[in-house]
Amino acid sequence: MLPMITEFINYGQQTIRAARYIGQGFMITLSHANRLPVTIQYPYEKLITSERFRGRIHFEFDKCIACEVCVRVCPIDLPVVDWKLETDIRKKRLLNYSIDFGICIFCGNCVEYCPTNCLSMTEEYELSTYDRHELNYNQIALGRLPMSVIDDYTIRTISNLPQIKNE
């Protein structure tokens, strides 16, 4: 008779413990119920990127002096700078500038150390293509400014999400 009573008590304790664990999990779930959703409907809604966002690099051909500082500070020696020395004026003339975004790690060193500020980071992050060779941008492709997410009328931007006040 005594083993049957102890088994019944153990069963009751296990049932109470299981109910407590289920209740704790349910309380955690309910604490998340009053939060706003994090996901967005991507092609139709886009988050506005921060000022410090490191997207595609924009290049201004006229400002570049072909000093190759960007190549030296790049951890993977990525920018390809072709130049020709003009002997009559003793200056370099830039012929070609290209960056392969399939290899670029978007560290921003080239932008930070450029002495003439001819490189800048944009908010463009949609660089996906079917062919990896299309990610090799020359100076013409790098010079195009992307359409701003803010200016695109087809997309609803989510900038300031209302905060829920806990009282």
Swiss-Prot record:
Gene3D superfamilies for this protein: 3.30.70.3270
Cofactor binding mode and count: Binds 2 [4Fe-4S] clusters per subunit.
SUPFAM superfamilies listed in its UniProt record: 4Fe-4S ferredoxins (SSF54862)
Binding sites annotated in the UniProt record for [4Fe-4S] cluster 2: C74, C104, C107, C110
Catalytic activity: a plastoquinone + NADH + (n+1) H(+)(in) = a plastoquinol + NAD(+) + n H(+)(out); a plastoquinone + NADPH + (n+1) H(+)(in) = a plastoquinol + NADP(+) + n H(+)(out)
PROSITE patterns, per the entry: 4FE4S_FER_1, 4FE4S_FER_2
Molecular function terms from GO: 4 iron, 4 sulfur cluster binding; iron ion binding; NADH dehydrogenase (ubiquinone) activity; quinone binding
GO cellular component: chloroplast thylakoid membrane
Domain spans labelled 4Fe-4S ferredoxin-type: 55-84, 95-124
GO terms of biological process kind: photosynthesis, light reaction
Bilayer topology term: Peripheral membrane protein
Keyword annotations of the record: 4Fe-4S, Chloroplast, Iron, Iron-sulfur, Membrane, Metal-binding, NAD, NADP, Plastid, Plastoquinone, Quinone, Repeat, Thylakoid, Translocase
Annotated localization: Plastid, Chloroplast thylakoid membrane
Disulfide-linked positions: none
Binding positions ([4Fe-4S] cluster 1): C64, C67, C70, C114
EC number annotated for this UniProt entry: 7.1.1.-
The protein's required cofactors: [4Fe-4S] cluster
InterPro entries, per the entry: 4Fe4S_Fe-S-bd, 4Fe4S_Fe_S_CS, NADH_quinone_OxRdtase_chainI, NDHI
Family: Belongs to the complex I 23 kDa subunit family.
Record PANTHER family: NAD(P)H-QUINONE OXIDOREDUCTASE SUBUNIT I, CHLOROPLASTIC (PTHR47275:SF1)
Role summary: NDH shuttles electrons from NAD(P)H:plastoquinone, via FMN and iron-sulfur (Fe-S) centers, to quinones in the photosynthetic chain and possibly in a chloroplast respiratory chain. The immediate electron acceptor for the enzyme in this species is believed to be plastoquinone. Couples the redox reaction to proton translocation, and thus conserves the redox energy in a proton gradient.
NCBIfam families found in the cross-reference section: ndhI, NuoI, PRK05888.1-3
Subunit structure: NDH is composed of at least 16 different subunits, 5 of which are encoded in the nucleus.
Stated name of the protein: NAD(P)H-quinone oxidoreductase subunit I, chloroplastic
Organism: Nicotiana tabacum
Protein encoded by which gene: ndhI
